[in-house]
């Protein structure tokens, strides 16, 4: 959290936006939307080696308790309405991470009749994590980039 003022007589001045965004970045709760092999790497990121809990990231089973959705894997036309429904059930503010080349743009199955060519055609995506499948480190880097994006937003002006 950045301080905009100087410390005088035991207090620090800062903006309310900075405090709210600091709280949001320290308690991101992702809704997992694992569709293919990228979901295995997402599960690995939550395991003890990478331990996303230390960043305040706790996977939630319900979209109503989540503020981040991680779309991992190939999105088919049949699954697209379910993705949109889960996204609409999430409370504002909400963010989406697209994980893997299949979620980003269709991947190997780009020319298949049943594959959506990127989940950004269904929901707005904030962070794209490339790779097939992306490593747990790449997902962790994407989450850190999302935290940086949240720090830069104006919360109260929305």
Curated annotation (Swiss-Prot):
Highest lineage ranks of the organism?
Bacteria, Pseudomonadati, Pseudomonadota, Betaproteobacteria, Nitrosomonadales
> Cytoplasm: present as a keyword of the record?
no
What are the EC numbers?
7.1.1.-
Q: Which reaction does it catalyse?
A: a quinone + NADH + 5 H(+)(in) = a quinol + NAD(+) + 4 H(+)(out)
Q: Give the cofactors, semicolon-separated.
A: [4Fe-4S] cluster
- Protein name as annotated: NADH-quinone oxidoreductase subunit B 2
Give the bilayer topology: Peripheral membrane protein
What PROSITE patterns does UniProt report for this protein, alphabetically?
COMPLEX1_20K
Q: How does it assemble?
A: NDH-1 is composed of 14 different subunits. Subunits NuoB, C, D, E, F, and G constitute the peripheral sector of the complex.
- GO BP terms in the entry: aerobic respiration; electron transport coupled proton transport
